């Protein structure tokens, strides 16, 4: 991804990126609806293997989000944590601390029952820190979206030194 401003805030350490992925709980999924953007907040799970990031989302078995993914699988996402406003002596010194991950990828709807179980386990591990197992019947009532991330960046803004 190109065009990042404030490159001094970017970092690439995988362990630090994993901390953000574990700490954040909501991912903002950007989709394309014709010539209009459409963004939806979602809970997520992830798998990071050798620097490759795969995101899993779950939701209803029908709806606008799924229709848009079927029409155009290109997606963009953002997630963040450590959001804390800070004050300054003048207006331009006010700001907010954060840590974020943004990525672009291709979304697909998972049909395989075993992969759906795996995805739901990953989602619950990310959201709760606990391990869960899922029966086949549980996979039938949700749709799993898998995002194969093509590229991602991470960025943070610490609080200013006083």
Feature locations, PLM:
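A generic structural signal for nonpolar/aromatic side chains embedded in well-ordered alpha-helices
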Residues: 20-21, 68-69, 123
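Short, structured patches in soluble enzyme cores that scaffold and shape functional sites
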Residues: 31-33, 59, 79-81, 149-151
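Short beta-strand segments
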Residues: 24-61
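Beta-strand secondary-structure signal
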Residues: 28, 56, 76, 104, ...
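Helix-adjacent hinge/juxtasegments
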Residues: 60, 64-87, 94
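Extreme N-terminal tail/first-helix region
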Residues: 1-23
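Short Pro/Gly-enriched beta-strand edge/turn motifs at strand-loop
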Residues: 11-12, 23-28, 127-130
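Charged, gly/pro-rich active-site loop segments
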Residues: 2-6, 82-162
């Amino acid at each position: 991804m190109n065009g990042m401003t404030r490159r001094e805030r970017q970092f690439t350490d995988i362990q630090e990126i994993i901390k953000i992925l574990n700490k954040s709980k909501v991912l903002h999924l950007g989709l394309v609806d014709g010539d209009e953007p459409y963004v939806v907040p979602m809970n997520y799970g992830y798998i990071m293997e050798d620097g490759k990031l795969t995101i899993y989302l779950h939701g209803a078995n029908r709806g606008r989000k799924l229709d848009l993914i079927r029409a155009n699988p290109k997606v963009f996402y953002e997630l963040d944590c450590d959001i804390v406003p800070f004050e300054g002596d003048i207006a331009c010194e006010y700001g907010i601390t954060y840590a974020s991950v943004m990525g672009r990828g291709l979304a697909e709807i998972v049909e395989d029952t075993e992969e759906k179980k795996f995805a739901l386990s990953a989602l619950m591990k990310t959201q709760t820190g606990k391990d869960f197992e899922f029966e086949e019947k549980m996979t039938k009532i949700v749709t799993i979206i898998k995002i194969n991330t093509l590229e991602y960046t991470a960025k943070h803004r610490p609080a200013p030194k006083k």
